[in-house]
Amino acid sequence: NRWYCNSAAGGVGGAAVCGLAGYVGEAKENIAGEVRKGWGMAGGFTHNKACKSFPGSGWASG
């Protein structure tokens, strides 16, 4: 499965509130996975935190 940051603002299209518009990743919501995707430790933490900071947002498979 592919994983993407899903937000209440509009699914993949609303991923801008998660830190990157249209972001598609191969990892669930874990910092190690984001580090593997090249975000770096700080980037992974920030991305995950932003993704979960909006009501109804989070990671979803697609």
From Swiss-Prot:
Keywords: Antibiotic, Antimicrobial, Bacteriocin, Secreted
GO biological process, one term: killing of cells of another organism
Superkingdom: Bacteria
One GO term describing the cellular component: extracellular region
UniProt-annotated location(s): Secreted
Thermal dependence of activity, per record: Thermostable, retains activity after heating at 100 degrees Celsius for 5 minutes.
pH dependence: Stable between pH 5.0 and pH 8.7. Activity is lost at pH 3.0 and above pH 9.5.
Keyword Signal applies: no
Principal subcellular localisation of the protein: secreted
Functional description taken from the UniProt entry: Bacteriocin active against the Gram-negative bacteria S.enteritidis, S.choleraesuis, S.typhimurium, S.gallinarum, E.coli O157:H7, Y.enterocolitica, C.freundii, K.pneumoniae, S.dysentriae, P.aeruginosa, P.mirabilis, M.morganii, C.jejuni and 20 other Campylobacter isolates, and the Gram-positive bacteria S.aureus, S.epidermidis and L.monocytogenes.
Family: Belongs to the bacteriocin class IIB family.
Protein known as: Enterocin E-760
